[in-house]
Amino acid sequence: MDPIFQSLQTVIDHYDELNEQLADPEVMNNGQHYMKLSKEAGEIRQTVEVYTRYKQVIQDIQDAEELLGDAEMAPLAKEDLSALKPEKEQLEEQLKILMLPKDPNDDKNIIMEIRGAAGGDESSLFAADLLDMYRRYAERQNWSMSIIDESTTEVGGYKEVAVMITGDNVYSKLKFESGAHRVQRVPATETQGRVHTSTATVGVMPEFEEIDFELNESDLEEEFFRSGGAGGQNVNKVSTAVRLIHKPTGIMVKMQEERTQIKNRDKARKLLASRVYDFYAQQNESEYAAQRKSAVGTGDRSERIRTYNYPQNRVTDHRIGLTLNKLDRIMNGELGEVIDALVIADQTAKLAELNK
């Protein structure tokens, strides 16, 4: 048997143990512990179900092969084998994918940062278009998105915007969106009808709670100030806005979206923790760098990953050579085909590495 299957029985045994614990009245009365065990069981349930079916198919193949020597039953046995053997191969591939090492961040919420880059006003407008695309995709996934920091431009775009996206397995779906996104289109301000090229960068970071990554208070410098406004009643007369600086890295975060200092500081700490963690993770040239590298890019924000060509209604993902002539639908949040292709490419590369 392939080495990857050798640990499957351990998974089955662990699943059985989890179900025994979940049936324990004491565990059922401990809501937090019960939820933790339920989540753990849910994460491996598909593996258990596929492996159970796989073992049944193996047994059915053996039974059918034993009937090949029976003249009366042989035709029926051959018919069964013609269906069972392809299913066996499909289940084996599915199990290999299910048994690939999981990214520990896959089930986390994310902080996504989008910045207008090369292209002036047009790049800021494209940053806003990307935000709308991700918002619509999030709605299709029943996720929630909220803006935690933003810097707008006079033309209605974004110099930069940071959002929190929460829901099931958000990072697993959007982690491949980090990089430089290039747009080719005729800007609204272009009078000659010429196509311009602009760029916006996207950064995707898993949301880190204190349990994952701790910011030392001694490393933080904080300032409180009044949040901006249009004047009159809109100007906050109390210093509710917060600026946090991580002194070792110089990373700075400011937050003024909330009405209270406590809420702004809490949001600022979460954003700062994710940025600092991401900074150190990218500096690590050994273990984390090897984990982060994949068939679909490094995750570096400067790496050009995708081009959106409006005149030709075309989107091209350069990492996997995928081209789709449905830009209008993709910008409307129909990102599933692109994201699924990226996930499959990543899994295929990992399987190839495993089989070396």
UniProtKB/Swiss-Prot annotation:
Gene3D superfamilies: 3.30.160.20, 3.30.70.1660, 6.10.140.1950. The modification N5-methylglutamine is found at residue 233. It is found in: Cytoplasm. The keyword Protein biosynthesis applies. GO terms for cellular component: cytoplasm. Methylated by PrmC. Methylation increases the termination efficiency of RF1. Pfam families: PCRF, RF-1. Keywords: Cytoplasm, Methylation, Protein biosynthesis. InterPro entries: PCRF, Pep_chain_release_fac_I, Pep_chain_release_fac_I_sf, Prokaryotic/Mito_RF, RF-1. GO terms for molecular function: translation release factor activity, codon specific. The keyword Protein biosynthesis applies. HAMAP family: Rel_fac_1 (MF_00093). Belongs to the prokaryotic/mitochondrial release factor family. Peptide chain release factor 1 directs the termination of translation in response to the peptide chain termination codons UAG and UAA. This is Peptide chain release factor 1. The gene is prfA.
